[in-house]
A protein has these predicted regions:
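Flexible glycine/proline-enriched surface loops and loop-helix/loop-strand junctions
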Residues: 125-135, 208-213, 327-330
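A glycine-rich dinucleotide-binding beta-alpha-beta segment and adjacent secondary-structure elements
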Residues: 278-332
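Oxidoreductase and adenylate-handling cofactor-binding alpha/beta cores
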Residues: 140-162, 174-186, 229-235
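Short Gly/Pro-enriched turn/cap motifs at secondary-structure boundaries
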Residues: 27, 194-199, 205-206, 312-315, ...
Length: 367
């Protein structure tokens, strides 16, 4: 989106996810458009290099355990003195304060402690964790918004940067709805309900088709529920007291699912989707990646794009979102596999270090 991003390269990040011929695929997409440098912050010369880098930077993001930067003499006060306009995002599992601040924090712990896992899964099954790093992703999104707010405040009001304390735990908890208020006012505790949301309406579930595919259907709004019953050839159900309004459908949710699921199970996915589309019902296929890549809507919007990678050749990955009308984002490069790929550019060209100095720092293990 126009900003220059530099990431401190680490070997451990390259061991995550799938690989092809030893090349980490997760790394390729997660760190696209970022310049990768190596930097040993436990070394005094590494600390001095960081101070030079942040002298004219807008934002610095770190995710060390609280107190680590201070141990290296790189705490907020020091960084702010060097660059009063700098915004520093401090990401940690549990935040910079509180009794858990020194605990190691991972997304899995946040997904558990936020209440997300407790409300996810089947009623008779275990708490269910997401199939990808949801908590980490949410923390990244919240961090991005926070940075934009801080930069706006700096540029239009105070002229000063600030420190942003972001835990991985709290963003995900924030997205889990009205649970705190419902417990405070009603003593209600939300439990696992599978794909149903009985507090909102019915039908809302996933249903298997005759040919083994799955469809997701949501008819929480009264008008949508009426359309579903008409679409499946049961218009009389709209006058049945058991299904006439949302509250009644929730009370008879098992019967609703049996009726809707029975009809869907007797039809192929193509037949069911066509029928529901005709009646403007809210229904969609449950896709794996093959469905996404072959879907004409994803193709028309170029949701998945192809990037030229120097090692793998043309590779597919998610495109930039959202779509800006005047200044669209672009994927300029995939993440380089070689550690410290941009060391010479950043340290040599930007900071003015000589090739001899770079070689010396590399020999010492500073970069």
């Amino acid at each position: 989106m126009g900003s220059e991003m530099c990431i401190r390269d680490r070997d451990s990040l390259r061991s995550l996810g799938a690989t092809k011929d030893g090349i980490p695929l997760w790394w390729k997409i997660t760190n696209r458009n970022k310049k990768c440098i190596t930097l040993n912050l436990s070394a005094s010369e590494g600390q001095e290099l960081l101070k030079q880098l942040i002298a004219d930077a807008d934002v610095m993001t770190e995710n060390f355990r609280p107190g680590t930067l201070e141990k290296w003499g790189l705490g907020w006060e020091t960084l702010h003195t060097i660059n009063p306009r700098l915004v520093v995002v401090r990401v940690s599992g549990f935040g910079q304060t509180g009794p858990y601040k020194d605990k190691p924090g991972f997304g899995t712990l946040a997904e558990a402690m936020s209440g997300f896992a407790h409300i996810t899964g089947q009623p008779d099954g275990p708490p269910t964790l997401p199939g990808y790093g949801l908590a980490d992703s949410m923390a990244g999104q919240f961090g991005t918004w926070a940075v934009m707010f801080a930069l706006y405040e700096r540029d239009h009001k105070s002229g000063k940067g600030q420190m942003l304390d972001l835990s991985v735990l709290e963003p995900l908890f924030t997205t889990t709805g009205d649970q705190a208020l419902a417990y405070d006012q009603l003593g209600a505790i939300q439990h696992r309900t599978g794909n149903r949301v009985p507090s909102i309406g019915a039908p809302r579930n996933t249903y298997q088709t005759k040919d083994g595919h799955w469809l997701a259907l949501s008819a929480n709004a009264p008008a949508l529920a009426k359309r579903v019953f008409v679409a499946i050839g049961r218009p009389e159900l709209n006058d049945d007291p058991r299904f006439a309004d949302n509250r009644a459908r929730i009370e008879h949710i098992d019967e609703v699912d049996a009726i809707v699921g029975g009809w869907i199970g007797a039809h192929t996915a193509e037949e069911a989707l066509k029928r529901f589309d005709e009646f403007e019902c809210a229904c969609a296929p449950v896709y794996d990646i093959t469905g996404i890549l072959s879907d004409p809507h994803f193709q028309a919007r170029e949701t998945v794009t192809t990037v030229s990678d120097p090692e793998l050749g043309p590779i597919k990955m998610q495109n930039v979102v959202p779509k800006f009308s005047r200044t669209p984002g672009a994927i300029r490069w995939s993440a380089p596999t070689h550690m410290g790929h941009h060391n010479e550019e950043i340290y040599g060209q930007q900071l003015g270090l000589s090739p001899q100095k770079l070689a010396e720092l590399k020999e010492k293990g500073v970069i």
